[in-house]
Amino acid sequence: MELTTRTLPARKHIALVAHDHCKQMLMSWVERHQPLLEKHELYATGTTGNLIQRATGMNVNAMLSGPMGGDQQVGALISEGKIDVLIFFWDPLNAVPHDPDVKALLRLATVWNIPVATNASTADFIVQSPHFNDAVDILIPDYQRYLAERLK
């Protein structure tokens, strides 16, 4: 597939997602990095988003709860170029009923080449990167060219 460039803005749109056994870990991480995160637009699946809002007072665009379709809503936003970074603390030791949605979310983040953290260490690296508060170009699939080729 041909690639094109997308510019992630200086003010990022960040999705925050956590499985039940990882919510407290994500909450602690968000509270530690609140001064950095406040400068960006936050999105989250339902329960996680409401917990973050309650604990920090930060505005969070909350989707549905993950098992109720929230993971798919975040994935759709990624596909539309509306999410720039995914912080997803998932539980590798416990299966969840919506595992296919989880796999789809991670697949879309990979397809659209956005930064993804699945644990606190990687999330720390992302927010401490010199690029975190700057506009940065990434390569993404050239969907218009892909569509034109498919419709020949």
Curated annotation (Swiss-Prot):
Q: Does the record carry Hydrolase as a key word?
A: no
GO cellular component terms attached to this protein's record: cytosol
* Record-linked InterPro entries: Methylgl_synth, Methylglyoxal_synth_AS, MGS-like_dom, MGS-like_dom_sf
Q: Which residues form the active site?
A: D71 (proton donor/acceptor)
What function does this protein fulfil?
A: Catalyzes the formation of methylglyoxal from dihydroxyacetone phosphate.
Its name, as the record gives it, is Methylglyoxal synthase
Q: Which domain of life is it from?
A: Bacteria
The UniProt record lists the MGS-like domain at 6-152
Q: Which PROSITE patterns does its entry note?
A: METHYLGLYOXAL_SYNTH, MGS
Name of the top EC class for this enzyme: lyase
